[in-house]
């Protein structure tokens, strides 16, 4: 309840002497007790019969500040005796602030001041409505959030203003923001892209308007849309005397058809005491099933015991004496797919069979007027009353007593008791009305029906010195805007005229006089959703006699919008028209259509009628105490201030509160356009279904001069129902809403779906399961046809007698489904599409899905780049050669060779922004490879004036997604660590890295400044007095851990990061850290990595030691041809064409230092770096890729040359015709590429003519065989740095396989972060949730047949992990899987082992009809389409099987 400062009567009336001397009552003035920006202040003026004939009324609103008042609103008008009219003051501006406001009002006739007073108005900040609509309430990673912001005035007219919008993740970090957004008619539409790995939980859209905050939440989580809905129907109440509890379960697909399957039903008591017990039953279900639990079953699990009369079914509870509710849980499992869905409901237990409810009864007694109430009789089991039960009467006993008599003094003479019987109608609702005795001070109503009983008691008495009362009521139960309703006024005295007023949302919205005791009013839109009606008259003695009636008013929008589909039912991929009908032209219609499966997930962020009613109720300021016991309280109950010279009665307690045309036409068209699913379909022109969105339509439609619009759209391929809704908004009529969503059923009564693995390895065979569903009227004969392809063969099984290998015929019963199996053997590598068609004389369907076929063995890659520099005017041509030989264990057919050329140093990295390296990046540092390179690319292209709109949007999208993901790893203290809050501490190295990247990105995307500040503050707290930074957490980058110089390296790294924070905190001082670095440099730095970072750090601050450090670094470099680089010492590593990751970082830091000193001397370093790039545009690992791209982008901007025009010619033994690439200023960033024949060895000759420079790169991908030695604990081929052992456990289990993987480091020191990659066997899957995390194992990711396990570090102690896997698909002749362990920041430090299942499937197991006698590997024959071969193989199979 709001506190109101309404002035008491003593303070209220300040009337002049003339007014006080005047005989009789002359005026009654009312005004709202509040003032609201945007809303008029409406004053009611009723000049009574003793008033002067004409009064000039003037009202002003003053704003008071610093003891000074200023008039800001005013109005005046002439009022006449005997009339009740209103005076309307203009509204406060919507931007008004919460200040002190006073209303001054005075009335003047020719000769006198009739009245004059003032009152303080309470400021109500709720002045506008801001609605935030999203297309859904739930989102998956990588999905797009579509949302609208609507700003409306309190009358639902558009409010044109600018809004600020913020997207916040569950940690309240600002992920994206838009400032000063304005939209047409107050509607702003935006979209927001979620990253592939966002923080799960409740996200929010925050909108700021006029310093007010508005929110809408949405959830981000992993989910699968339900394809069918389960509902449980039970009565809300059940009598303990009932013989049983009955209910039903309904299971329907979103397209309306029944679900066939099994039903598990559980009765679970929800009491808080005793041992939990339940009842579980199982049934078959075909869309509907009835169930019952008898009283004996329920008694057992609810701890009930029979009373003496067991036959009556009465029970008492053991402890306590009355049972709590029970939950009924229904789980339906679809027979065709095995998918389950659950629903539940609660049942409350009553001690009686019948429930009596008394409501809408009089709460304040008015003697001699009627007491009214509504009584409802119902069965506790929810069933209708039977004709036999209705023959019994409802018995009411009314007891009326005198007031102020304690119980001990009461006797029956003081009580008036009356018993009345009522006949019960079919609906069980009875209206009761009887007079209140003149002596009554208390009234009790008791109602009885069979064993049910209920009662209410009313103690409150209306206060009137003259005992004069009126009663205001209506018989209309449903009152809505625009429809008249009747009001009846009864009283115990005669009266002539009656005044009335209507108040809603704190404002006086209607007023007038009536001479009849029955009159009608027509609600306007301003009345909704609740209105408070006051009726009154002035008695002869001057007393105000009044009453109040509160009514709900159903909201009816003046601006109407309707959506219609041109057809109610369509087939997937059909064309259909969405038709829009609006009331007014120049309207904006916002439409959303979503899969009905989305609506089954309970929550919704749609704008509905309930949304609007709730929104409008927020404007209401009435007290709603329900205890208006005198004439003053009646006005107060509706939030009114009253000024009158009539008698206004109040109690002492009151002092406390002083502070359709289109629908018919479309319906006809819909009837004519019903889809006839029995029509014959053309098998030769079957649409293949591929498009399955969750949100189909999100459209802002501008109607222009029309009130009718039609859009043709293509129905997606989902077999479901689509639910479309819309709102409309226009300048004059404001907001409107579709009252009923337009539902479109996208359904075909005959369809198929495929079940196949995501990928297999060449040489493996798999079972393609084809399920056909038939909802036609009859059983049909269906031909299943696999589209022939050179990419796979179909294996013949012994029982294939009803068709050929590509074609089968099957009978599919009506309202049922059948599954067929086709054994498939892929023959080509890559993505293989499989198209299946199901055809019958009456219907057909086709579906295409792809399967990825990978080569066997372990993936390897090689890249070689050459820089063709023709920038010297004296050089017109250059030639370069590149060579590669495949190792002897290369898998035949896995080889892929490609030549690329591009005209810009960063060109290949720009083209590969989405995936720069071949490693997963699932921790806080590695994620930044998805973020940081985009900054450097944008910087570089902006400087070169080569930034295109498409590339900018692409880079910004990657950055926003990377930013979202990175915030997963921010800890509560503001620091960042590899795995966020699960780590024991934040990392200064990683926090500095993230801070630097966020500061660099702040120019392009929205970065929450609070995130930056918290990170910087945490970093600064980890600096020692001498300027040295220290690392409290684990250092996952191996080059930064251990050794005497690691604090020096860390400090240099952090200095380069925190300097960027100067734009937010200009007084940052890093001189102590610089002096620390200079001192350590003067002592000597033997490590090249540390020296490189120090050189860069000292260069960024202009240290006098910077050039000396850089010179020393260059002296230690290696030179080869026109390149310059560094080689770090270290243990022997697994073979790789790329250098160590640390060597790339050293070169990158040296190049960054050269951007500040002696630019030309850095060109040889740049050339070397370019040559180390992989085919994706990145380098070895994440950190080296980020630093190298930063260095190349900044350095290239300094040495970039204009006017490139180069002709490249590529020749070689495997190139029958020369390949020509033309690179000029118009296509510098175009990646030219050609596939080459994979000859061994590969020799590629490149010649360049012209001017400028180009980069040519040879990329080779291939697989090597997993040799037998790789299965042993350790390879003798390479000096591995990890010991790795893989043990397979599944001796007798065909469906499960457990891997036990153990590893340790073959060295005394602890490693940095280690990545374990487990390539699963084809057909098997593993859940990342089934592998528990530990201090060593920090994260597990599942990625399309592969598990990535992130280990914090590995030492000499063995670390083991158990990986349970499950067979999801039947795959025979399974090839080896592999397990690898590698140092993430030095991937050449690795070990690889292969493994396989001990229980292998032969091809005969792929068909369910085949009797397989052996579970060892069997040979399979791939049968071609040749008829002779088919006969031969059939004979061969016959002899083999016999």
UniProtKB/Swiss-Prot annotation:
Residues the record marks as carrying a glycan: 67, 117, 246, 278, 370, 421, 1088
Signal peptide positions (record): 1-21
Lipid linkage positions (GPI-anchor amidated alanine): 1419
MF annotations from Gene Ontology: serine-type endopeptidase inhibitor activity
InterPro entries (alphabetical): A-macroglobulin_rcpt-bd, A-macroglobulin_rcpt-bd_sf, A2M/Complement_sys, A2M_N_BRD, A2M_TED, Alpha-macroglob_thiol-ester_cl, Alpha-macroglobulin_TED, Ig-like_fold
Alphabetical UniProt keywords: Bait region, Cell membrane, Disulfide bond, Glycoprotein, GPI-anchor, Lipoprotein, Membrane, Protease inhibitor, Serine protease inhibitor, Signal, Thioester bond
GO term, biological process aspect, one: negative regulation of wound healing
GO cellular component, as recorded: cytosol; extracellular space; plasma membrane; side of membrane
Cellular compartments annotated: Cell membrane
Bilayer disposition of the protein: Lipid-anchor; GPI-anchor
Glycoprotein is among the record's keywords: yes
Modification(s) after translation: N-glycosylated.
Propeptide: 1420-1442
Keyword Signal in record: yes
Isoglutamyl cysteine thioester (Cys-Gln) crosslink site(s): 923-926
CDD domains hit by this protein: A2M_2 (cd02897)
Residues covered by region (Bait region (approximate)): 595-704
SUPFAM superfamilies (UniProt xref): Alpha-macroglobulin receptor domain, E set domains, Terpenoid cyclases/Protein prenyltransferases
Annotated function: Modulates negatively TGFB1 signaling in keratinocytes.
Description of how the protein assembles with itself and partners: Heterodimer; disulfide-linked. Interacts with TGFB1 and TGFBR1. Forms a heteromeric complex with TGFBR1, TGFBR2 and TGFBR3 in a ligand-independent manner.
Similarity comment: Belongs to the protease inhibitor I39 (alpha-2-macroglobulin) family.
Name of the featured protein: CD109 antigen
Lineage, broadest ranks: Eukaryota, Metazoa, Chordata, Craniata, Vertebrata
Gene behind the chain: Cd109
